[in-house]
A protein has these predicted regions:
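An alpha-helical, amphipathic repeat domain used for nucleic-acid recognition
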Residues: 1-121
């Protein structure tokens, strides 16, 4: 009974708040851990946070910053990957980005941009 009162009080005063937690978790994971939206969403679901709570905050992620993070990850990975041809390299980069939780449309976009930049040089 006392525990319930304490928890209720903490929730009323916003010390315990799922939305605040989601906002901070999403911000930290995409900015510092460089996770994609899919992996962040899965991690929040594992923490028993309802999708209706975290989905709006995932959509608030700045698209340009998100793509810049993905592009930088792919450029760094490209330097360390050993592949016999362009097809194998692309597959390895796609698998890497998918494992980080990025969406296929964003991965394809960044790989295409990277290939276009390589052709310009």
């Amino acid at each position: 009974d006392a525990i319930d009162r304490i928890i209720n009080r903490l929730e009323q005063e916003k010390y315990i708040d799922e939305e605040r937690f989601c906002r901070a978790f999403i911000h930290d994971k995409y900015r510092f851990a460089k996770w994609g939206k899919i992996k962040i969403g899965q991690a929040l679901q594992l923490k028993k946070i309802p999708q209706r709570v975290f989905s709006p905050y995932l959509n608030e992620i700045d698209e340009d910053e998100y793509l810049t993070i993905l592009n930088n990850l792919l450029m760094t990975k490209r330097k360390s990957v050993h592949a016999e041809n362009e097809f194998e390299l692309t597959n390895k980069l796609v698998r890497f980005a998918l494992s980080r939780g990025f969406e296929m449309k964003d991965i394809r976009h960044c790989i295409t941009l990277s290939d276009e930049n390589d052709n310009l040089e």
